[in-house]
Amino acid sequence: MTEVMELNDADRALKARHRAIWAMGDYDAVATQVIPALGPVLVDGTGINPGDRVLDVAAGSGNASLPAARAGARVVASDLTPELLDHGRQHAASEGLEIDWHEGDAEALPYEDGSFDVTMSLVGIMFAPHHQASADELVRVTRPGGRIGLISWTPEG
């Protein structure tokens, strides 16, 4: 096996562990207690307008996707963990919001270059193992002149 293959195998194993960890707890309950006010802050900060095509990366259960959809944006929510997306679908359905929910890896987003006016992540993408690869993907899928917005914490807190 080559070093590249070992790295890919290690990455796949790490992402599988991440997916399992996020799926085992009650992330949705924690998120609705800890970060509910941050979604509207991110939506306002990125200047999301009606009709904007928005990608929420590492969307979880939709803490930023839902306020973006309420603002009239066409939202795609992507996350590594399907169980979290299921919670988001339920929240969106209860409000009559249309959001496209897709399982996806922040380091290899399944979207064409320049597909989105706004790409954002609310306390999500920071958990991806390879930050540079994730940042490169955010830039790639955001149209030239588009906006990227993140809310994350730093190692210092």
Give residue spans per PLM region:
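A short SAM/SAH-binding and catalytic strip from SAM-dependent methyltransferases
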Residues: 117-131, 154
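A short glycine-rich, Lys/Arg-flanked "PGG" loop and its adjoining helix->strand segment in the class I
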Residues: 132-147
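Class I SAM-dependent methyltransferase SAM/SAH-binding core
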Residues: 53-108, 133
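Conserved alpha-helix/loop element of class I SAM-dependent methyltransferases that forms part
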Residues: 32-52
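N-terminal, positively charged/glycine-rich alpha-helical extensions of SAM-dependent methyltransferases
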Residues: 1-23
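Class I SAM-dependent methyltransferase Rossmann-like catalytic core
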Residues: 25-30
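Conserved class I S-adenosyl-L-methionine
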Residues: 147-157
